[in-house]
Amino acid sequence: MHLKKIKFLSILCIAVFFQSCVTKPPESPDNICLIFKEKRSWYKAVMRAEKRWKIPPYVLMSFVYQESSFKSDARPERDKLLGFIPWFRPSTAVGYSQALTMTWDDYKDETGNSRANRKDFKDSADFIGWYASKGYYQGFERTDARSLYLAYHEGYGGFKKKTYRTKQWLVKVSDRVQARSTKYQQQYWGCAQDLKKKKFLFFG
């Protein structure tokens, strides 16, 4: 009995440890300036993605907000068998970007980032930038969060075929993504210079 209790406590401690390792969502998800002030590493990751893939910070962050609400372990809810029994998940999406396994593998192959983890914000930010950059060569505007999000969801082939037209719920979601991107953009313009200061990046 004593050994069973020790084993139980050990498992409990391990579970608590791993739970503590999960990065918590920002306290003020509606304000990009406060997000970057709280999450210094996120700011640097987004700046690297912008430099590499030319995706504006406010567009990228509007994607993350919509896809995962800034939760590192986000997954689609399980389907329900007979209406109440938890069943399989509808897709393989995981993490901040909700990237599908197959698309994530394509990203790793193309970029050489073989150790990329979908639950890592830096990797997820780079993934979103990588995927969005494909749209620039097809005539997408870098600030057109709505169209970029529709292509992100449907694939560029699906976007070209306008498959989203049969999904009014998706069109409404893409409108929300655009609205949030615009809101983040206005906020970002007011704090961009402060964010660039070294003391802001490494102290406080």
Task: Explain the meaning of each model-derived region.
Residues F202-G204:
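Short, solvent-exposed mixed-charge patches
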Residues C13-V16:
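Hydrophobic membrane-insertion alpha-helices, especially the h-region
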Residues M1-L9:
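Bacterial N-terminal signal peptides that target proteins for export
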Residues F18-S20:
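C-terminal motif of bacterial Sec signal peptides marking the signal peptidase cleavage site
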Residues V22-K196:
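Catalytic glycan-binding domains that act on GlcNAc-containing polysaccharides
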Residues S10-I11, Y58:
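Residue-level detector of alpha-helix boundary/anchor positions
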